[in-house]
């Protein structure tokens, strides 16, 4: 499965690095900030884009790694795209998968995947993620795949 991200903060960047270092294909990370695209990409070897289409079309799994209070709004945007069969996940510790309202109608599968882990920064947090515990809640039918 190919993984993409919306949101380039500590959680998104740390999970991105963890997946890459563990040979899980990552399609890139959507960010609203053009400066992040042009500057950080060269330093970190991450693929950033300001085109949500690029991330959505290439990804089987999409992580919404945005602040908790932005998840619902980002989801409202994501669900306007053809996402049938995709796994849509957020990493909030305070919100369940129900924040992805109407996901059944899109044909996608929703999950809350919360790492019980202190993300100290974008550059090194991924190194200790193998020891982290995760709570996973969402679509029961595809739980083993996620």
Residues of each region from the PLM?
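Short, charged/polar "capping" segments at the starts of alpha-helices
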Residues: 35-39, 96-99, 141-145
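Rossmann-like NAD(P)(H) cofactor-binding subdomain of soluble oxidoreductases
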Residues: 44-124
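Short, hydrophobic beta-strand segments that form beta-sheet elements in well-ordered domains
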Residues: 27-31, 88-91, 136
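Nucleotide donor/acceptor-binding cores
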Residues: 1, 86, 132
